[in-house]
Amino acid sequence: MNSGIDLQGTFIKSLIDLGIPPGTAKAIWMPLPMILMLIGATVGVLVCVWLERKISAAAQQRIGPEYIGPLGLLAPVADGLKLVFKEDIVPAQADPWLFTLGPILVVLPVFLSYLIVPFGQNIVITNVGTGIFLWIALSSIQPIGLLMAGYSSNNKYSLLGGLRAAAQSISYEIPLALSVLAIVMMSNSLSTVDIVNQQSDYGILGWNIWRQPLGFMIFWIAALAECERLPFDLPEAEEELVAGYQTEYSGMKFALFYLSSYVNLILSALLVAVLYLGGWDFPIPINVLANLVGVSEANPVLQVVSAALGITMTLVKAYFLVFIAILLRWTVPRVRIDQLLDLGWKFLLPVGLVNLLLTAALKLAFPVAFGG
């Protein structure tokens, strides 16, 4: 198996070669992954917002952003700057502490979840053995922030939106976790890196989507509900609740909700790519490519090309799923709250349990194909 390029080791070694003490070199490296994560997630959101506006315009036979930068690429930046410089208003009867804490509790867990997303063999901020468990734990914090935002606003629409958001998030977390448990069972690991490695032996034929089509559908539907994307955007349904739990928010606090929504969408797409679509894995195994060009897998140039290909493949897979999510916004009608809860509790939950039991049975019956 290709061990990948060791970015941390290479960076620290380069600094040591320049005469910097090893301790100082390690200290310089420590904040870099977090800074890169924040920059990468923010740029990803800007790209996602631009795509949403252009795809939405195309779906409605419009042009969309056109004049703010080439092809309107700077329109999301203009939107962000506008929100940053807007006045931050706190309603007179609101609870100021909870009102401020709500958006922070919503956006922080989403950013922290990026810690376990691998873009390559060694291109991951923290490869912890319980990465999937960490992500599930972090995602369960978000409903608390949504409830805080809805309750503290002292507004009936905000409260209803917060209650809807919490109910929706809790309802779909369980099917989401069940679909992931089936993947964990096949991979014998909670590490996202191990899960991708388990899919890398046979190229595109080794991807988990072929062995877990049911789990893939459950995960994708539940992820859309967690991100509050149409047809599951009931917490902020404009026709019913003005803007839901965001009704009383303005300025930077509103921007945090806006940011959280898109960061969560990209995170969900990345996790689908990692868990079901082989992550950074190229459809043709790297050892086959190495044999075709007649070089060793340990060749430094091949390692760099492999790392670049890995990042590209992960992002291509993720943004294809983002494209599907945006397209769904204009093709599927919004469901009612009772339909949404029925889908989560009466359909996805039982199907998720059956899928988990079926995976366990297939693992015992066909250990080679299902990771026995």
From Swiss-Prot:
Keyword Endoplasmic reticulum (UniProt): no
Annotated transmembrane regions: 27-47, 65-85, 97-117, 128-148, 166-186, 204-224, 266-286, 308-328, 347-367
Superkingdom of the source species: Bacteria
InterPro entries, alphabetized: NADH_UbQ_OxRdtase_su1/FPO (IPR001694), NADH_UbQ_OxRdtase_su1_CS (IPR018086)
UniProt keyword terms in alphabetical order: Membrane, NAD, NADP, Plastoquinone, Quinone, Thylakoid, Translocase, Transmembrane, Transmembrane helix
4Fe-4S keyword on record: no
Topology term for the membrane: Multi-pass membrane protein
EC number, UniProt record: 7.1.1.-
PROSITE patterns (UniProt xref): COMPLEX1_ND1_1, COMPLEX1_ND1_2
Compartments in which it is found: Cellular thylakoid membrane
Top-tier EC class: translocase
GO biological process, one term: photosynthesis, light reaction
Predominant location category: membrane
Assembly mode: NDH-1 is composed of at least 11 different subunits.
PANTHER family given in the database record: NADH DEHYDROGENASE SUBUNIT 1, NADH-UBIQUINONE OXIDOREDUCTASE CHAIN 1
Protein family membership: Belongs to the complex I subunit 1 family.
Cited function: NDH-1 shuttles electrons from an unknown electron donor, via FMN and iron-sulfur (Fe-S) centers, to quinones in the respiratory and/or the photosynthetic chain. The immediate electron acceptor for the enzyme in this species is believed to be plastoquinone. Couples the redox reaction to proton translocation, and thus conserves the redox energy in a proton gradient.
Protein name: NAD(P)H-quinone oxidoreductase subunit 1
Organism: Nostoc sp. (strain PCC 7120 / SAG 25.82 / UTEX 2576)
Originating gene: ndhA
